[in-house]
UniProtKB/Swiss-Prot annotation:
Record's protein name: Carboxymethylenebutenolidase homolog
Residue numbers bearing the N-acetylalanine modification: A2
Active site: C132, D179, H212
Gene that produces this protein: CMBL
Tissue: Widely expressed, with highest levels in liver, followed by kidney, small intestine and colon. Present in liver and intestine (at protein level).
Organism, scientific name: Homo sapiens
SUPFAM superfamilies recorded: alpha/beta-Hydrolases
GO cellular component, one term: extracellular exosome
InterPro entries (UniProt xref): AB_hydrolase_fold (IPR029058), CMBL (IPR042946), Dienelactn_hydro (IPR002925)
Cited function: Cysteine hydrolase. Can convert the prodrug olmesartan medoxomil into its pharmacologically active metabolite olmerstatan, an angiotensin receptor blocker, in liver and intestine. May also activate beta-lactam antibiotics faropenem medoxomil and lenampicillin.
Keywords, ordered alphabetically: Acetylation, Cytoplasm, Hydrolase, Phosphoprotein
Subcellular location: Cytoplasm, Cytosol
Gene Ontology process terms (BP): xenobiotic metabolic process
Residue numbers carrying N6-acetyllysine: K36
Similarity annotation: Belongs to the dienelactone hydrolase family.
Length: 245
């Protein structure tokens, strides 16, 4: 788990200059970014933000990448108008900031988004992908909502509790070897719990030499050594959705 002195040392990394292919919409009480699939296959993916919010271009880039593979994607504002974390902010107040943005208390928003995807986008199969804060949300949601056909949790903090294994549908977990937010002992705990108790398909992948945020907050060309891992993780994400949706 993250330490108290630096409770969630998430570096915003390389903020992409990216305009996006989708559009912003209002879904009941939530703003959201939606990208329609070029092929109407009746499949949709909810992409859940990290602590830097739903408007981060990097997250929208990933949503558009997923959309290009046959899925309508939606990036809702799960902070519901509250400010995202400022990367230059005082990390000592981060725990207090986080208390009003609980990744396990987004059921009202999920209900609204599911209704929108089914009624307005004609989605018959729905999956979820989330990063950091959103990765934690994905883990929680995959234990609660059986209608999510597949989930991908990307460096979501692992909660040390007895029910972390009770997944309802196939879930992929992506971690980074050198993640100071999520130590490898937490990944080992999750691995042990799932191996002992999980009754659905799952996979845990830890990427060598990588750090928190590597999948969606690094430029593809930022380092020749990192690029293969970024590409592989993104490919794994798409392959998991394709396999189970």
């Amino acid at each position: 788990m993250a330490n108290e002195a630096y409770p969630c040392p998430c570096d915003i990394g390389h903020r992409l200059e990216y305009g996006g292919l989708g559009r912003e919409v209002q879904v009941e009480h939530i703003k959201a970014y939606v990208t329609k699939s070029p092929v109407d296959a009746g499949k949709a993916v909810i992409v859940i933000q990290d602590i830097f919010g739903w408007q981060l271009p990097n997250t929208r880039y990933i949503a558009d990448m997923i959309s290009g593979n046959g899925y309508t994607t939606i990036v809702p504002d799960f902070f519901v108008g509250q400010e995202p974390w400022d990367p230059s902010g005082d990390w000592s107040i981060f725990p207090e900031w986080l208390k009003t943005r609980n990744a396990q208390k987004i059921d009202r928003e999920i209900s609204a988004i599911l209704k929108y995807l089914k009624q307005q986008c004609h989605a018959q199969k729905i999956g979820i992908v989330g990063f950091c804060w959103g990765g934690t949300a994905v883990h929680h949601l995959m234990m609660k909502y059986s209608e999510f056909r597949a989930g991908v949790s990307v460096y979501g903090i692992v909660k040390d509790s007895e029910d972390i294994y009770n997944l309802k549908n196939p879930t992929l977990f992506i971690f980074a070897e050198n993640d100071v937010v999520i130590p490898l002992k937490d990944v080992s705990l999750l691995t042990q719990k799932l191996k002992e108790h999980c009754k659905v398909e799952y996979q845990i992948k830890t990427f060598s030499g990588q750090t928190h945020g590597f999948v969606h907050r690094k430029r593809e060309d930022c380092s020749p050594a990192d690029k293969p891992y970024i590409d592989e993780a993104r490919r794994n994400l798409i392959e998991w959705l394709n396999k189970y949706m």
